[in-house]
Amino acid sequence: MNRRTFAKGVALLGAAGPAALARGAAEKPEGTLGEYYEEPARKLPVRKFDVVVAGAGTAGVVAAIAAARQGAKTILIERKGYPGGTVTEGGTALHSFFNLWKAFPGVEKRQVVKGIPQDIVERLTKAGGTSGHAEMFAGYNYDSVCTAIDTEIYKLVVFEMLAEAGVTVAVNTLLAGAIVDGQRVRGAIAESRSGREALYAHALVDCTAFGDLAAFAGAKYTEPNDYPVVNSMGVAGVSVERYYEFLQSHGAVSQLAKGWRSGKEGQIVRLDTNGKAFPQEFKDEARKIGLAMVITTVHDDYFMFIKMGLKMPVSPTSRDAVAAAELELRRRQAKAIELLNKHVPGCEKAFIARTSPTLNIRRARVIACDYDITSPDVLEARHFEDDVMAYGFHDSAPRLQVKGGGTYGIPYKALRVAGLENLLAAGMLITSNHDAHMSTRNTVCCMGQGQAAGTAAALCAARKCGTRDLPYRDLRDALVKAGVVLCES
């Protein structure tokens, strides 16, 4: 059975998921016990929207707000009980609203991502939930600005912004399938404790990180499994200043940014190390558990993000492999606290105050789109005739940097899912090339992609046109009006 047949089966039969249909469930008579079970056909209640956004993470939140601000009746589906995604669970900070000007003397400082992402930062600032755009004083060949956040305040702020925009926010709701008619995606199947339902829309946006909606719809994809998975934790009972003094005394500070922390300006909000200060026992054990000591914080006595990582043998779409990784990562977190207590000044009384509810990925499925952004596109600072945002950060810096501290463009065609109409994608599920993806997957880039995709979806719904029929000029005008920066170089 091919993906197209599978997708139609999900839509028409209301099947619970891929396994039941993909393995030929129809071969068994209804009610027969055996290797497979065929779910009986059932009618699902229908709700109609202009735009469906799947996944309320980094890209999805912004996509839904953007669509609703354009006047589209929008629903946002999220399996957890809150919006936020990787921003609140696995990131170290928001990277990056600015070009890498500090690494290139004479290059102008420019904020290249604005629009809804900047609206979020301004709301966080009012709520005391961000460092602000904190300038880097060390390690600025990696990033010129660090924007640290409070994970819990972020969840509240974006939840409120979604409500204010008029988005129907369906948290605690699973995406269970796609409704497909030929090459056109007509809607999504959602399931919650309120029941199973069909959500019809004129345009849909997949922001699930895993590419679940696109996969259900029959899109082509690959699963490169080229990154480790992580679980991040927040660590309390620490002294940021004592830890900094320890690193500084050994010449071990590799990154340093200062901004707002606990209501005071000019405080350390980001701190990384080259590892020189740590005893060999700590280094050896930290390496075994994949411990990364990149610290960001907006509170005294708290490290907002410390990560444990591991490389899975298979893609993080594997349920059983993920279960094993979830357990192992939590064991590693406990070991990390032991190491901090024993070896690191300022961390003698450290304890786990927060963990991610599930492991964090950098990608799982890579969804084929009309255009696949390449590494030369990123590194050579290329722009396109259909740019929907500009971006200038690369997570492999200083080894890889956008040329001359400039920016490259994300084209609209890179957000259109190949072979399907009415379906867009945004976030870490686009871009197959690893080096290019090391830029496009980052949080602020995902946010910008979300604004573009949500805006495009709303315009398609208003004009009753397909995602490939939308005039670029209309999309460009709407994005610029909403504060998006385009055509920077």
Residue ranges of each PLM-predicted region?
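A short, basic/flexible loop-to-alpha-helix module at the beginning of a structural domain
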Residues: 33-48
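N-terminal Rossmann-fold NAD(P) dinucleotide-binding loop
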Residues: 60
